[in-house]
Amino acid sequence: MGERFWSIEFSAGTVLILSFAALFVGALMYWIRGGIRGGAPPTHVYFVWERSFIIAAVVLTALGLALLEALLQNSAGGVLARVGAIAYLFGGVLVVAAEASSLNQGLHKNSSEQNWAPATIYVVLALLAQAAIGGSLLQAGLLPPWIGWATVVWNIGWLLAYLIKRGDIYIPFVHHVMPLVIGIALVTHAT
């Protein structure tokens, strides 16, 4: 277990998988309370836990992408990996700040009063960042090419859909699917 367990490839994959697990818990809490239909959380503590899992998912994704960048830094995909990791980090800082400020404002009683511009910037940065990560995976040849292509197509496709769609574009699930796929592939490849 020793050397493979502590490899950067295994570590990056594990952190990316954990990011999806954190998102899943937060999204499940949101779904249980009927958040999609505008349902309020039962308590403020419940709301804090729900949003904290979403925040944790963003932080873990940023860490996982940074580890992936370190793995790819000396490959043909090194530049795109670095651009992707840094862009996601910048976007992540913005959405964590937006989520954290929502904790202080209460239970989203009037979400129109909340400043979600940082979350919108996060959405664009996260999609572009992960498209760059997909390109870096294609250039590096570390994982099967379909993973790189799927990452590029998924993220550019959502970006184009958001350009057409009006209204709320902050759907955290969108930004954690491909990191999960990449994470599983990295862990499988490392073992």
Could you tell me what each predicted segment is?
Residues M1-T191:
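Hydrophobic, aromatic-enriched alpha-helical segments typical of multi-pass transmembrane helices
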